[in-house]
């Protein structure tokens, strides 16, 4: 983040606006809505400012040019003049005095910037582009206007009104949170939105009085995070990610996806890197049981799909043995997502009538697979976790009958801006990888369908920096 978002309490506090035009007037209106006392410094003011002075006793005007002593006693400063020298003087003086300052349309002179605001008081939504594109921030706010009805303000007011009663009824924080999640996403909220305020209050109180303050029942959410692009998450995955109390995640979960988990959820890194598991599988299973028995909603977040080389079956088998409630949310597996973003269809009527998923993990320095079954014509082979064993993989496929010229590709960090695709053949792929070191996660695709990439590639990543090497081609 270039800026840290905060909300300031400026009620009945002295703020300074330097400038008397329409932009300064708009800023004054925002500060007035927040309850500030505003002092305006400008030789002249427009009619809009004159109206504000007549309407509000909390705004005053000094018809002078700016001087540093105007900052005395101010907690916030906004400069909105057409004179660069004046704006810079305000910025320099405010910084020297340690007072937050905003210079309109000049981020370099600001110590804070003004977001685009959606006001559903007491709910406030602020959208900022970091000063890079105020127009984009306003467009995003316009979208939020349609998504967040004005009645959300009343909903928040009721939540504040009954907060004390709910706190008194439930001794456990988890129970209070569960209660409010139920209220704010169910019939109570719908009644408020429909204007049935009395019915909403009656429903809330009845539900509260009938609720028992018992230890909550824990649950585990086994969620597939997909191959990396956050846009590929399912709606169900998003919902469960937002209500989890704790998340246990693997190395292959993209940081952008982890950022979408509820912010105050505890985070536990499980590792799952080759030969370096931060938590062994048995420890993960035991931890899931322990946390769920404590009444927590546990998000077990796995890259791709939890049931495809993800050991998800082992985890829920353990949960079932201990009678722990669980849900499973499938994710887009890497074979499907990465191949699509690489422009490689896994099946095609002219090239491949079947597709096989295998794992390429080395065991005793060999890849133990049914090579005869893999080395069949008109078949696509997708190899997970095959980077270290790629030489053995290619050698065995050739030895069992696939031509050396069989097209092959390896994709690094597929579906993300860091995606990089290297294409070659079974004979050349190991050399290509040796000359262009890649970092996991990677996926290997072998078969005639790889040839289609030259025509079907559509996803343009931003990390295409490798040079051309004889014997292979690299595409974005």
Curated annotation (Swiss-Prot):
Q: Which domain of life is it from?
A: Bacteria
Ranges for region Uroporphyrinogen-III C-methyltransferase: 218-476
Q: Quick one: where's region Precorrin-2 dehydrogenase /sirohydrochlorin ferrochelatase?
A: 1-204
**Positions of S-adenosyl-L-methionine binding:** 227, 303-305, 308, 333-334, 385, 414
* Phosphoserine modification, residue list: 129
Recorded metabolic or biological pathway in which this protein acts = Cofactor biosynthesis; adenosylcobalamin biosynthesis; precorrin-2 from uroporphyrinogen III: step 1/1; Cofactor biosynthesis; adenosylcobalamin biosynthesis; sirohydrochlorin from precorrin-2: step 1/1; Porphyrin-containing compound metabolism; siroheme biosynthesis; precorrin-2 from uroporphyrinogen III: step 1/1; Porphyrin-containing compound metabolism; siroheme biosynthesis; siroheme from sirohydrochlorin: step 1/1
Q: Which residues cross the membrane?
A: none
Q: Which residues form the active site?
A: 250, 272
Sorted alphabetically, the Gene Ontology BP terms of this entry are: cobalamin biosynthetic process; methylation; siroheme biosynthetic process
Q: Does the keyword Phosphoprotein apply?
A: yes
Q: What is an example of a GO molecular function annotated in this UniProt entry?
A: precorrin-2 dehydrogenase activity
Q: Which UniProt keywords apply?
A: Cobalamin biosynthesis, Lyase, Methyltransferase, Multifunctional enzyme, NAD, Oxidoreductase, Phosphoprotein, Porphyrin biosynthesis, S-adenosyl-L-methionine, Transferase
Q: Return the EC number.
A: 2.1.1.107, 1.3.1.76, 4.99.1.4
Note the NCBIfam families from the entry. cobA_cysG_Cterm, cysG_Nterm, PRK06136.1, PRK10637.1
This chain's function reads: Then it catalyzes the NAD-dependent ring dehydrogenation of precorrin-2 to yield sirohydrochlorin. Finally, it catalyzes the ferrochelation of sirohydrochlorin to yield siroheme.
> What protein family is recorded?
In the N-terminal section; belongs to the precorrin-2 dehydrogenase / sirohydrochlorin ferrochelatase family. In the C-terminal section; belongs to the precorrin methyltransferase family.
* The protein's name in its UniProt record: Siroheme synthase
Q: What is the originating organism of this protein?
A: Nitrosomonas eutropha (strain DSM 101675 / C91 / Nm57)
- Taxonomic path: Bacteria, Pseudomonadati, Pseudomonadota, Betaproteobacteria, Nitrosomonadales
The protein's gene is named cysG
């Amino acid at each position: 983040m270039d800026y840290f978002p905060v909300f300031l309490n400026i009620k009945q506090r002295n703020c300074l606006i330097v400038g008397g035009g329409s932009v300064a007037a708009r800023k004054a209106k925002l500060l007035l809505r927040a309850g500030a006392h505003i002092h305006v410094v400008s030789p002249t003011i427009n009619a809009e400012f004159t109206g504000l002075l007549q309407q509000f006793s909390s705004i005053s005007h000094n018809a002078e040019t700016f001087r540093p002593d105007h900052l005395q006693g101010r907690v916030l400063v906004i400069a909105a003049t057409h004179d660069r020298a004046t704006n810079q003087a305000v910025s320099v003086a405010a910084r020297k005095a340690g007072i937050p300052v905003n210079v309109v349309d000049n981020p370099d002179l600001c110590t804070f910037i003004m977001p685009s605001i959606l006001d559903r008081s007491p709910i406030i939504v602020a959208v900022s582009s970091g000063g890079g594109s105020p127009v984009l921030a306003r467009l995003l706010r316009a979208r939020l206007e349609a998504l967040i009805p004005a009645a959300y303000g009343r909903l928040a007011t009721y939540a504040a009104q009954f907060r004390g009663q709910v706190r008194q009824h439930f001794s456990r924080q988890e129970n209070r949170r569960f209660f409010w999640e139920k209220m704010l996403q169910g019939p109570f909220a719908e009644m408020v939105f429909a204007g049935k305020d009395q019915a909403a209050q009656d429903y809330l109180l009845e539900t509260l009085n009938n609720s028992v303050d018992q230890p909550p029942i824990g649950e585990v959410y086994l969620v597939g995070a997909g191959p990396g692009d956050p846009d590929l998450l399912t709606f169900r995955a998003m919902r469960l990610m937002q209500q989890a109390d704790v998340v246990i995640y693997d190395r292959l979960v993209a940081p952008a996806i982890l950022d979408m988990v509820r912010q105050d959820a505890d985070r536990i890194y499980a590792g799952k890197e080759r030969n370096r598991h931060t938590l062994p599988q048995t420890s993960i299973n035991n931890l899931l049981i322990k946390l769920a028995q404590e009444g927590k909603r546990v998000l077990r977040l796995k890259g791709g799909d939890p049931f495809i080389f993800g050991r998800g079956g082992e985890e829920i088998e353990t949960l079932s043995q201990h009678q722990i409630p669980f849900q499973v949310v499938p994710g887009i597996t890497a074979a499907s997502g990465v191949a699509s973003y690489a422009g490689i269809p896994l099946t095609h009527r002219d090239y491949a009538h079947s597709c096989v998923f295998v794992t390429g993990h080395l065991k005793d320095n060999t890849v133990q697979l049914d090579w005869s079954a893999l080395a069949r014509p008109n078949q696509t082979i997708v190899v997970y976790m095959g980077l270290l064993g790629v030489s053995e993989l290619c050698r065995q496929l050739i030895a069992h009958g696939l031509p050396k010229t069989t097209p092959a590709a390896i994709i690094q960090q597929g579906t993300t801006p860091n995606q990089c695709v290297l294409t070659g053949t079974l004979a050349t792929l190991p050399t290509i990888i040796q000359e262009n070191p890649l970092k996991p996660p990677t996926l290997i695709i072998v078969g005639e369908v790889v040839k289609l990439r030259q025509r079907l590639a559509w996803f343009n990543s931003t990390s295409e920096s490798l040079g051309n090497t004889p014997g292979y081609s690299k595409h974005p």
